[in-house]
Amino acid sequence: MSVAGPTLVNVTDTRGTFALTDMPGVRLQDADFTVVDVETTGWSPGAAGITEIGAVRVRGGEVIAEFTSLVNPGTPVPAPITELTGISDPMLALAPPAAAVLPGLLAFAEGSVLTAHNAPFDLAFLTAACAAAGLGWPGFEILDTLKLARHLVSTPDEVPDCKLATLADYFGAPVQPSHRALADARATATVLWHLLGRLADREVYTLGELAAWLAEKDAEAAAARTGVAAVTARRWPLGVARAPRARTPQWLAGPRRWLARVPRLPWRRGRGIR
């Protein structure tokens, strides 16, 4: 059985794309987004490998190119993963390794905003694979559609959750996610464009405005919940707490030598901390 290497399909003229240095002022409808998805043998890049990469490059809501390749992870595919994705060891026997696929992907995505649903997962595998292959990781701008959806889609009023399958169904994506890389990337591309369409009501029109808006929303979300607070002195951590109000008196009521070691105690009250 022969397995083709990386495949480019539906390629059209991509002249007019923007370099990263030009991106902040680029309007959302004019920017290039490369939506990527990876399938893997497990959940951690330290113990698992990539089995498939799919990417869709979109501009103005239109697909201008697609990239897809099976990837030989160098290790057997666990049975539960084969059951989930349909990707098996025989399918990957003659597939290229990640080191042979990644240069094509990086070139495909050059000058675009790299986008994924739950981006930290995909990026962890891609960056680890690049490091293992001795490839430098470009300075991509990154957009996570999961994070964007959590700011723009009401749950549970509109949808019960912001999983890719839920959002793809809600927005009527012509291709539904199926735990195959290209299908999932296509579904994410549809979700992305519907989410970007909601930003006009927030007066967000450019990539720079989107970055600023996301930073503001992330800060608001962090302040609104009681989370993990790390309190540090100049060179060493004083402590970490999930209940800062309860823990701070304990820190400050300790031996006087602790207080003598604290030159400054920076803090800021958040709405989630009372």
Regions from the PLM with identified roles:
Residues 57-76:
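Short glycine-rich, Thr/Ser-proximal phosphate-binding strand/loop in the N-terminal lobe
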Residues 79-87:
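Short, basic/glycine-rich phosphate-binding loops at helix/coil junctions
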Residues 75-80, 162-163:
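Short, glycine/polar-rich helix-capping loops at beta-to-alpha or helix-loop-helix junctions
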Residues 1-48, 58-62, 90-274:
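DEDD superfamily 3′-5′ metal-dependent exonuclease/proofreading module
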